[in-house]
A protein has these predicted regions:
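Ser/Thr/Pro-rich low-complexity tracts
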Residues: 1-83, 236, 282-285
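Residue-level detector of Asp-centered blade-edge/turn motifs that repeat once per structural unit
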Residues: 115-120, 162-166, 212-215, 260-264, ...
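Residue position within the beta-strands of beta-propeller blades
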Residues: 125-127, 170-172, 220-221, 268-269, ...
Length: 418
């Protein structure tokens, strides 16, 4: 998306842009062009308000620079927008996993994102069904492969989660069997550069796992009734074994996606067109059988509405984000987080409040151009931007940036104030 332009009019500016230095709201901006009577620049990132200051050097460098500060303060409300960070397709819309800098890197089927702020450099960890696990270094602007499906001994690598320290990644495996003799969860270590898979628990096939810091336990799912499993100590082997806590569905077999609230108070369980909530019991230190929070099991559609009236197509990964309004005006339950979730089938990102009110956050824009809601368009969140099967989402609280794994666009998109 284009940045906002600023034109400054006056006299005796000169014609050398390199001699003109401008700050807007304390942020430096580049002088794009100038004539003797006009300066053209753009609003720099994070320039929300403040004074506009100009310093103009003399043409020969012999005289002192002229400095001027506008009396009227600059006040500009920046709007968040969708952009493409990295990833591209060929002329036929195809792509594959290619490592390299952000200009060269490509993605085959990006689906699951984890924000990695535990290491020296800020990164994203990404994978898709069948792997590989890759690192997106946001500081070096490079993409590298950590572990492939074959290198890790996976039948069909699925999705992953960090432990509380960020030193361990747990990775699920859809091995396609009801036998408990197969490795279901592997773990990989930062100390080994996440390049070697070790067995963590053997169980029936599954798709997703999540670590709970409150009781230092790993939870994962299975296909059968979407059963929630817990990895517990096995005194016989000295390792871990799976214990089923409950079936998520009464009459259906299907996988789920899970996300635990930052303070551990509950877990959202997503699948079959709805989002369920499992409360954490602090007396038993265990999650309880879930109830429906938003949407209705087995009823697909598109409807940003309150609670059970909402309709999802294929809700996928979600992430919790602090809402400053809840901090200024505390809720009775003390919850300060909204939930943002990708809906793969509806090609959008939904926002869900703690009360279950579902609203469109981003995507499904530019509809008047071709009456489609999927596509690859950057721009304003709801009127312009489009996604194509967005699956993964992560949030960087420091920069207030969302990262989206846009599967069929084979790219990583961002939602931020540029």
């Amino acid at each position: 998306s284009l940045r906002t332009q600023i034109h400054i009019y006056g006299d005796n500016f000169g014609t050398d842009p390199s001699k003109i230095h401008i700050t807007i709201g304390g942020q430096y901006t580049t002088t794009i062009g100038c004539t003797n009577t006009e300066i053209y620049c753009i609003v720099p990132p994070k320039a929300f308000d403040g004074n506009i200051k100009i310093k103009i050097e003399s043409a020969d460098g012999k005289n002192s620079p002229i400095e001027y500060e506008f009396e009227k303060k600059f006040n500009y409300t920046l709007q968040p927008s969708v952009s493409t960070l990295v990833g591209s397709e060929d002329e036929n819309g195809n792509s594959s996993d290619v490592d390299g800098n952000f200009e060269k890197a490509r993605f085959g089927n990006p689906q699951w994102l984890l924000m990695d702020t535990f290491g020296i450099e800020k990164c994203l960890i990404i994978n898709g069904q069948g792997g590989p696990i890759r690192r997106i270094n946001l500081e070096a602007k490079e993409v590298s492969t950590l572990l492939t499906n074959g290198q890790g001994g996976f039948r069909n690598m699925q999705f992953m989660s960090f432990d509380a320290t960020g030193d361990t990644l747990f990775v699920s495996d859809d091995h396609g069997s009801s036998s408990k003799d197969n490795r279901e969860i592997a773990y990989i270590l930062r100390s080994e550069e996440f390049r070697k898979a070790h067995p963590y628990v053997y169980d029936r096939t599954g798709y997703n796992n999540v670590y709970c810091a409150l009781n230092k336990s790993l939870y994962y799912n299975t296909y059968w009734k979407g059963g929630l499993q817990k990895a517990v100590h096995d005194p016989t082997t000295g390792g871990k074994k799976g214990v089923e806590l409950f079936g998520v569905y009464e009459n259906s077999d299907s996988g789920t996606f899970m996300c635990i609230h930052p303070d551990g108070r509950f877990m959202y369980i997503t699948g079959r067109n709805c989002i369920l909530v499992s409360q954490y019991n602090k007396v038993t230190n265990e999650f309880q059988k879930p109830t429906t929070f938003a949407g209705r099991e087995g009823e697909a559609g598109y409807s940003p509405s309150p609670g059970p009236s909402a309709r999802f197509q294929e809700p996928y990964q979600g992430t919790f984000v602090k809402n400053e309004e809840y901090i200024k005006n505390p809720r009775p339950d003390g919850n300060i987080y909204d939930y943002y979730i990708c809906d793969r089938g509806n090609h959008c990102i939904f926002k869900i409040t703690p009360d279950g009110n579902v609203s469109l956050f981003a995507g499904r824009g530019s509809v008047s151009s071709d009456n489609k809601v999927s596509g690859n368009i950057d721009g304003e969140l709801k009127t312009e931007a489009r996604f194509d099967n967005p699956c993964g989402i992560a949030y960087d609280e420091e920069t207030q940036t969302f990262y989206i794994a846009d599967r069929e666009n084979h790219s990583i998109r961002t939602i931020s104030i540029e």
